[in-house]
Amino acid sequence: MNLRVLYEDNHLISVFKPSRMLVQDDVTGDASLYDQVKYYLKNKYHKPGNVFLGLLHRLDRPVCGTILFARTSKAAARLSEQFRNHSIKKIYHTFVFGHPAKKADTLVHFLTKDHELNITSAQLEDVEGSLRAELSYEVVETFANTSLLKITLKTGRPHQIRSQLSAIGHPIMGDMKYGAPDLLPDQNGIALMATELTFKHPTKEEKITVTADLPANWFEYARNS
């Protein structure tokens, strides 16, 4: 097991989720990050019996980056409240096709999901059954045919970043489900990473920021696309 621990104390643990890995078990029976973290804690601290681990949020399976778990029920309750009231700052970076017309902008869409196809549509009108989605982006760097964007997520809807960027004509590299022309050269997920989480520590009056670096090969793919 090759688990990348980004931050750990007695109350919480943050780890790096690789592309293609599930955060939580599903019907596929594939290995999940949740189970890996429980195994890591059980063995590191020689804990008998079941290990408590609070699942606080998720990332889409093709997405990689920072994931936060609670190690106590008190921490789980307090951190879950921060996720519910949107006080946790979530930063993503992504490589997209094309060059956005604006160097920075806020996008608001209403999302509807086709559960059979597992795809989300983003539209400007509020239709019945849709969920409001908001994000802000900044263009960090441009290449010949692609751009690197920094995304600040205001809401946390499934497939939100993927569908909203596709809706404005800039699909994420490797994300063929949302309009990318092909997979990444390594065929490993999509070029979207949760790079930063900032939250209030559940027992101390301090802010914690957990970060992860973008892989160098994504820059190479962006330059060559």
Regions found by a protein language model. Give the residues of each.
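RNA pseudouridine synthases
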Residues: 1-225
